[in-house]
Regions:
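A generic structural signal for residues embedded in beta-strands
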Residues: 123-124
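Extended, domain-scale alpha-helical bundle/helix-rich regions
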Residues: 1-44
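Amphipathic alpha-helical coiled-coil/heptad-repeat segments
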Residues: 1-12, 169, 186-222
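Intrinsically disordered or highly flexible coil/loop and linker segments, enriched in small
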Residues: 12-19, 73, 77, 172, ...
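Non-catalytic DNA-recognition/assembly elements of restriction-modification systems
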Residues: 45-74, 197-205, 210-222
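Basic, amphipathic alpha-helical recognition segments used for DNA target recognition
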Residues: 63-71, 96-97, 118, 131-194
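Residues that recognize and position ribonucleotide moieties
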Residues: 57, 89, 180
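Sequence-specific dsDNA recognition surfaces
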Residues: 44-50, 65-80, 87-118, 136, ...
Length: 222
């Protein structure tokens, strides 16, 4: 099963010291009674009431940290930020977001604090909360962003499209008086329906085909 592969990969990364085990680690599993449970420490809690729909055969529910490494941004020292391409590209928020792929920033830093690895989904955790993009290169991210880096068997583009459906949920969870924001704990509680890899690929083909047709229609109207 795909989820077992991603869990095994995560455990190996923890053993190698490349990532740390979450102190509030949560695991979703299906019980013998066909109900879904969330394992928190030594406690198993039924979560059937939280699930919005029934999954197709072969799919399973999981929480986001089971299939991706989540890295919350942290701004580097202001004196290390420059406009002369020294160091690594730096992004504070969504200024250089596009419809999907991240544009280059005009700022860099020589002392990066938090790195979003190549092929990460970038999530705005400060207003406007829930905006998403994909980076095809490693970048430094500030406090306005989180990096969601999928494990080997999860497609970043599929994750990008699926997370779009959570924008309303994330905004509902956002708090703050001047600028609303969401915490790491909120991001880590996102429930994901996980299809087999082949079905991820089929979903992506369908989505990209639809967008291609929409693009052709828009061009014909201009």
């Amino acid at each position: 099963m795909l989820l077992e592969r991603t869990r095994a990969e995560k455990e190996e990364l923890i053993k190698q010291g490349k990532i740390k085990r979450d102190k509030k680690e949560s695991i979703i599993f299906k019980g013998d009674d066909n109900s879904y449970y969330e394992k928190l420490g030594n406690t198993d809690v039924c979560i059937d009431h939280k699930l919005p729909f029934t999954l197709p055969d072969g799919w399973t529910w999981c929480v986001l940290p089971e299939i991706a490494e989540i890295i919350m941004g942290s701004s580097p020292d202001g004196t290390t930020i420059n406009n002369s391409n020294e160091g690594i590209e730096f992004h504070q928020g969504k200024i250089f977001f596009t419809n999907k792929m991240l544009n280059p920033s005009d700022k860099s830093t020589t002392q990066p604090s938090k790195i979003a690895p190549k092929d990460s989904v970038l999530l705005c955790v400060r207003a406007p909360v829930g905006e998403l993009n994909i980076t095809d290169r490693s970048i430094c991210i500030g406090r306005g962003l989180a990096s969601i880096h999928p494990y080997h068997y999860i497609d970043a583009e599929w994750l990008f499209y699926w997370l779009q459906t959570y924008k309303g949920y994330l905004n509902m969870k956002a708090t703050g008086s001047t600028f609303v924001a969401i915490t790491a704990d909120i991001v880590k509680t996102i429930l994901m329906p996980l299809p087999p890899l082949k079905e991820q690929e089929e979903i992506l083909k369908t989505i990209n085909k639809v967008f291609f047709i929409v693009d052709l229609i828009e061009k014909s109207l201009n």
